[in-house]
Amino acid sequence: MIKRVSIIVGLLVAIVALPVLLRRKSATASPDAADDRLVIITPHNESIRNEYGEAFARWWKERSGRSVYVDWRTPGGTAEIRKVLDSGFAAAEERGAEGMGIDLFFGGGDYEFKTQHKPKKGGGRLVRLQVFDKHPEWFGEQGVSQTFSGEQYFNDDHTWVTACLSQFGICYNEDALQRMGMDAPRSWSDLGDPRYAGYLALADPSKSGSVARAFELLIQQQMQDAMVSSHSSEAALQEGWAKGWQLIMRLCANARYFTDSASKIPQDVGQGDAVAGMCVDFYGRSFSDELKRPDGTSRLCWVAPEGGSSLSGDPIAVMRGAPHPEVAQAFVEFVLSDAGQMLWNAKPGTPSGPVAKALRRMPVRRDIYTEENRSQFTDGDRNPYESTGNFVYKPELTGKAFGTIRSLVRIVGIDSHEEMKSAWKALREANFPPDAMKVFFDVSALDYDSMKMGDARLGSTEALDAAQRASELGARFRAQYQKAEAMAREAMEKGERP
C-alpha cells in the first residue's frame, strides 16, 4: 500500500515538474535586473506577446550583450488603446513632455496607425522608422511592398510598417450545419440567411479595428458588385452602399450575441454554442487545430469569403518621445528580420518557430515564402500573395467612412439588438411581408452622399455632440424595427402571406 502511494506521489510530482523541466530558460530579464527596458502597447494575444518578448530578448542579448525587460501594456482592443494614447499624449502636452511613456505600438489594423500618425489634435505621434534606411533590401516588390490588393503596408513618411498579414473570413461548425441541413457558408451574403437566426456569432466593431474592417469590406464588396452590373457609377455606389448596410442588418438580426473578444467566436462555434461567425484567419485556424480529430479533420472550419476579403496588415510603430528609442527601433528591426518573420508561422519547436504554440500568422515579407521556409510553416500550403480571392480593396470608396462604419454598426445592430431580433422573428413568422420588410430595411438615414466622407457629428471631438447624434440615429432605427414588427404581426392576424 505504501509502495503504491509512493508511486502515485512520484508520478504526480513528475507531471507537475515536467513542463518546468522542458521549458526553455526565459531570456527576458526581470524589471529590476534588466539592462534595458521596452514598453509596448498592443492588442496582440498572450501567445504572441510571450513568443516575441522572449525571441527579441535573445536577439538583443546576442546583438548588444545587454538584457532587456519587455513591459507589455494590454488595455484591450484598438479602441481602448486609442483612448490610452489620446489621454496620455494630452497629459504629456499639458506638462510640456514629448512622449507619454510608451515605446511601441504593435498590432491592430492600419486605421489606428494612420490616426496616430495624424491625430485630430496635436502633432504626429509616430517617428520615422530606421529600418527603412538600415535594410532597404527588405522593401519593394520582393519584400514588403507599399500596397497590395489595395491595402497599404507602410506609409510615405515611414512612420509605421506592417509586421504580418491577416484576413477576415467565416468560421463555421460543419457538424452543426449538417444537422440543420445547411450548406457551408462561402460568402458574407450567406450569413444573412434567416436560418442562422440565433446561431451567428459576431464581434463589436467599436472595440476592434480588425472587426470594423470586416464590416467595411462587406459593404465595399456590395458596392464593387453593383458597379460591375451598372452603367452609372454614382447610382451603383449608392445602391451598393445601401445593399451593404441591409446585409449588415441581416447579420445583426441573426446574431446570437456581440462579443468584445474576437477570440471567443471560433471557440463558441467550435463548441456548438453558435453555428457560424465572422472571424480572423489565425483565430479560426488555431481553434480548428485544437479540435482536430484523429483522422485530421475538424468540426470547426474557416474560409475566406468569395470575393469579399483583402489581405490586411497588422503594423508596428515607434511612438514619439519613446523613453527607450534605441531598443524600440531595434524591436522593429527584429520583427521584420528573417527570424522575426519566420516566428509568425514556423512550427513550434523548430529552430525558427515559437516555443509553446503556433501563432498562425502570415509574414509580410514576400521573400520569406521560399520553398525551404514554407516547409517549416504551420500553414505551408498558404502563400497569401498567390491567393487574393479576386478582391481589391479601394480606399477611395469607404476609407474615409471607416470610423463612421464602426459607429453605425453599433447604432444599427447592437444598441437596438433586442428590438431588431424581435422584429426579425415576427418577419420570419409572417413569411417576410414586403411592406414590413421595406420598413425594417430602410437605410435612407445612412445615405452614401452624406456618409462617404464620414459623419461629422459621429466623429466629432465633442463627446456630447457625437453621443446626441448616435442617440438620434438609434431612436430612428428602434422605431422602424418596432413598426416593422407591428406590421408583420398585423399581417399574420389578417392571414396575409406573400
Describe each PLM feature range.
Residues 6-21:
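Hydrophobic membrane-insertion alpha-helices, especially the h-region
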